[in-house]
């Protein structure tokens, strides 16, 4: 439970808020940067349920927070509560980064930047004409926006619940076509980029054989495959792609890069996503599995 009696400090203090929150890597990322750059500051995880989220958001400035990150299940509510939403948050319809400008609560969504920056790191020439995206949840919104900004002319959207995909395609307008989950083999060969935003096969590795199997042998040999899930680092989706000789990018970098936007705003330094940071987070993940 969030402690609304936290004392104010002379240095910046930021948060990540969600429920559950114990699994969040954000405190490790931000505190790594604070130490690296020799900055006075603090970044704390705050467990806040949906019933208490509104109160937390309207109170955090009074108890010494300058802003923070928002994770599940609060991103859409954070967007609704903000006085100012930038273009990215407005298009996505959800916010994961908050700060104050005067008395106005401001919001953006850094997932779009995080997704693109991660691919820039590992495949700087990523792009093309056609992309294939699996999933139609909140993360898919951020990625569809990133792909449209990158200039993809055709984006195929596939989701087990077709109506959700239809709604998302309608929200983003032209160039997005919804395709049947069980007919992906008909379009797989066209994709220059293949993105998974679902948790298929993560909790149950055998799930892919019953509900979904992507035959990457039918994909372009030059196709790039990425999964936004980073636990495990190499998901079943990426394993399938690797086994067919395709280049893959894991989802950890998206998490690291999306944190840059908030850190710069709260602490005044634009941090770098380095191998040292990635190694530190991977070590934490390894310890959690033991």
UniProtKB/Swiss-Prot annotation:
<feature type="binding site">
    <location>
        <begin position="24"/>
        <end position="26"/>
    </location>
    <ligand>
        <name>shikimate</name>
    </ligand>
</feature>
<feature type="binding site">
    <location>
        <begin position="159"/>
        <end position="164"/>
    </location>
    <ligand>
        <name>NADP(+)</name>
    </ligand>
</feature>
<dbReference type="Pfam" id="PF18317">
    <property type="entry name" value="SDH_C"/>
</dbReference>
<feature type="binding site">
    <location>
        <position position="251"/>
    </location>
    <ligand>
        <name>NADP(+)</name>
    </ligand>
</feature>
<feature type="binding site">
    <location>
        <position position="71"/>
    </location>
    <ligand>
        <name>shikimate</name>
    </ligand>
</feature>
<feature type="binding site">
    <location>
        <position position="96"/>
    </location>
    <ligand>
        <name>shikimate</name>
    </ligand>
</feature>
<keyword id="KW-0057">Aromatic amino acid biosynthesis</keyword>
<feature type="binding site">
    <location>
        <begin position="135"/>
        <end position="139"/>
    </location>
    <ligand>
        <name>NADP(+)</name>
    </ligand>
</feature>
<dbReference type="GO" id="GO:0009073">
    <property type="term" value="P:aromatic amino acid family biosynthetic process"/>
</dbReference>
<dbReference type="GO" id="GO:0004764">
    <property type="term" value="F:shikimate 3-dehydrogenase (NADP+) activity"/>
</dbReference>
<dbReference type="InterPro" id="IPR011342">
    <property type="entry name" value="Shikimate_DH"/>
</dbReference>
<feature type="binding site">
    <location>
        <position position="228"/>
    </location>
    <ligand>
        <name>NADP(+)</name>
    </ligand>
</feature>
<keyword id="KW-0521">NADP</keyword>
<comment type="pathway">
    <text>Metabolic intermediate biosynthesis; chorismate biosynthesis; chorismate from D-erythrose 4-phosphate and phosphoenolpyruvate: step 4/7.</text>
</comment>
<dbReference type="InterPro" id="IPR013708">
    <property type="entry name" value="Shikimate_DH-bd_N"/>
</dbReference>
<dbReference type="GO" id="GO:0019632">
    <property type="term" value="P:shikimate metabolic process"/>
</dbReference>
<comment type="subunit">
    <text>Homodimer.</text>
</comment>
<dbReference type="InterPro" id="IPR046346">
    <property type="entry name" value="Aminoacid_DH-like_N_sf"/>
</dbReference>
<feature type="binding site">
    <location>
        <position position="230"/>
    </location>
    <ligand>
        <name>shikimate</name>
    </ligand>
</feature>
<dbReference type="GO" id="GO:0008652">
    <property type="term" value="P:amino acid biosynthetic process"/>
</dbReference>
<keyword id="KW-0028">Amino-acid biosynthesis</keyword>
<dbReference type="Pfam" id="PF01488">
    <property type="entry name" value="Shikimate_DH"/>
</dbReference>
<dbReference type="InterPro" id="IPR036291">
    <property type="entry name" value="NAD(P)-bd_dom_sf"/>
</dbReference>
<dbReference type="GO" id="GO:0009423">
    <property type="term" value="P:chorismate biosynthetic process"/>
</dbReference>
<dbReference type="InterPro" id="IPR006151">
    <property type="entry name" value="Shikm_DH/Glu-tRNA_Rdtase"/>
</dbReference>
<feature type="binding site">
    <location>
        <position position="111"/>
    </location>
    <ligand>
        <name>shikimate</name>
    </ligand>
</feature>
<dbReference type="Pfam" id="PF08501">
    <property type="entry name" value="Shikimate_dh_N"/>
</dbReference>
<keyword id="KW-0560">Oxidoreductase</keyword>
<comment type="similarity">
    <text>Belongs to the shikimate dehydrogenase family.</text>
</comment>
<protein>
    <recommendedName>
        <fullName>Shikimate dehydrogenase (NADP(+))</fullName>
        <ecNumber>1.1.1.25</ecNumber>
    </recommendedName>
</protein>
<dbReference type="GO" id="GO:0005829">
    <property type="term" value="C:cytosol"/>
</dbReference>
<feature type="active site" description="Proton acceptor">
    <location>
        <position position="75"/>
    </location>
</feature>
<dbReference type="GO" id="GO:0050661">
    <property type="term" value="F:NADP binding"/>
</dbReference>
<comment type="function">
    <text>Involved in the biosynthesis of the chorismate, which leads to the biosynthesis of aromatic amino acids. Catalyzes the reversible NADPH linked reduction of 3-dehydroshikimate (DHSA) to yield shikimate (SA).</text>
</comment>
<dbReference type="InterPro" id="IPR041121">
    <property type="entry name" value="SDH_C"/>
</dbReference>
<dbReference type="InterPro" id="IPR022893">
    <property type="entry name" value="Shikimate_DH_fam"/>
</dbReference>
């Amino acid at each position: 439970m969030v402690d609304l009696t936290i004392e104010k400090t002379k240095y910046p203090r930021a948060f990540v808020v969600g429920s559950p929150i114990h699994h969040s890597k954000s405190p490790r990322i931000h505190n790594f940067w604070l130490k690296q750059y020799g900055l006075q500051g603090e970044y704390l995880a705050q467990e806040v349920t949906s019933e208490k989220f509104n109160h937390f958001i309207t109170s955090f400035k009074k108890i010494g927070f300058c802003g923070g990150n928002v994770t599940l299940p609060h991103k859409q509510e954070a967007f609704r509560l903000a006085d100012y939403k930038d273009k990215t948050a407005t298009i996505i319809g959800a916010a994961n980064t908050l700060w104050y400008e005067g008395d106005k609560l401001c919001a953006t969504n850094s997932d779009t930047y995080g997704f693109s920056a991660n691919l820039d790191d590992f495949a700087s020439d990523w792009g093309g004409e056609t992309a294939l995206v699996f999933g139609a949840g909140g993360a898919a919104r951020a990625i569809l926006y990133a792909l449209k900004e990158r200039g993809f002319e055709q984006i195929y959207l596939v989701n087990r619940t077709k109506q959700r995909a239809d709604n998302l395609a309608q929200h983003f307008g032209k160039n997005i076509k919804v395709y049947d989950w069980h007919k992906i083999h008909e379009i797989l060969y066209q994709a220059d980029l293949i993105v998974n935003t679902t948790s298929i096969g993560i909790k149950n590795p055998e799930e892919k054989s019953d509900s979904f199997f992507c035959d990457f042998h039918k994909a372009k040999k030059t196709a790039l495959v990425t999964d936004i899930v980073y636990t495990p680092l190499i998901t079943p989706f990426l394993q399938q792609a690797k086994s067919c000789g395709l280049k893959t990018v894991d989802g950890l970098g998206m998490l690291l890069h999306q944190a840059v936007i908030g850190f710069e705003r709260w602490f005044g330094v634009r941090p770098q996503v380095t191998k040292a940071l990635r190694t530190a987070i991977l070590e934490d993940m390894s310890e959690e599995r033991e």
